[in-house]
């Protein structure tokens, strides 16, 4: 009884497997479905994945470029004593300098003057509290772009 039951189960399994195997075989042997499906599936997958990869790489590149630019700008400022205009001159956007160049002398003065000012103000603030209110009121105009233009 058990042998015949096993045979009937195996025959049933074969019976259920053969139509399932015939279904995909019929689809695979059909040249039109085989030619149309993979080209539609693969480009869709690539199109869905490529923009995400491009945006991700673009974000990384922007972050890296901005970090490198800021590092290079600060290194150039510290080592060569350049102003920001000297660093920004080789830019590919000359239309931006139409508004920057008239301000170049004031910007250069603003960039050169605050560099000596912050260390003494920090020293005076930590050394004596009596000079703190005057330095607090005098230091913000030196950092603001309009402060020096009004003083000069």
Curated annotation (Swiss-Prot):
InterPro entries: SEEK1. Residues 1-31 have a biased composition (Polar residues). It comes from the Eukaryota. Expressed in skin. Also found in heart, placenta, liver, skeletal muscle and pancreas. It holds the Pfam family SEEK1. Residues 1-42 are annotated as: Disordered. This is Psoriasis susceptibility 1 candidate gene 1 protein. It comes from Homo sapiens (Human). The gene is PSORS1C1.
